[in-house]
């Protein structure tokens, strides 16, 4: 039986969820693909653990870490066939994730990105590096996780032209807006989202529209062939919204949503435009019924018409999106030979 060695960089809540799901699906990988999948390395901010025969109890909190194994040194020691990058998002510099992905792709390992920063900063460069080394770069976990955004573009609508993609890509803002329309103050709604584990302790990344803008930037570049920088995307957040405005929306039967939009413009030079804006929808629109904690995406195509998908957010769903990418690699037969 062939083997596939997997390493995870970034071992917080999502990285640990990836490890748990991976362990639970090992028998499935053996039975369906004839591949023995082994988790050979995990990397945290304080160091890493590596065992080419497979880590025993990778979730052990008290296991010693080798502080010398970070970045390229970790990739060299683990020698993974697949690196799953699950570290924090740093959309200004790409953070440690950028170094891990570059090292893995350059070493001939497939990359599965969950954190967004590296992709926002240099998706074209990472894609070129993957192509040059004959490996795949998969990004489902970074583009609204369980919501099938990049898959809609790459697979479901591959036989036509996608003219518009728009979506409710950030569950935190959708939750807060939903609660505000129910009469809850912004600060209280945000505190609820934090207690539910949906919003970060510093939620500005979500409520100021940065999270949605990052996802839109990645999708525009990866799915529409654009070369947009994050600061080229017009961006709005969800605060402040006055009580009077909320009352007017209620009276008019409108529902507010923070929406990311990508549009392919026609003309002499076909171009892609992207934005994040606070929009309102009548009850008949698909987005109006997307409740608290949910996400949705809609595309307009030339041949298939309109397609809509809806999903829920959670660390487990994000981890599952990364394993969907991993399973696609197994389906392609590019790992475990």
Where are these regions (language model features)?
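Rossmann-like NAD(P)H-binding beta-loop-alpha module
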Residues: 131-199, 210
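N-terminal glycine-/serine-/threonine-rich beta1-alpha1-beta2 phosphate-ribose binding loop
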Residues: 1-106
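Substrate-binding/catalytic subdomain of NAD(P)-dependent oxidoreductase enzymes
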Residues: 179, 190-289, 294-296
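Rossmann-fold NAD(P)-binding glycine/threonine-rich loop
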Residues: 89-106, 114-143, 147-154
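ATP-dependent carboxylate/acyl-activation modules
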Residues: 286-337
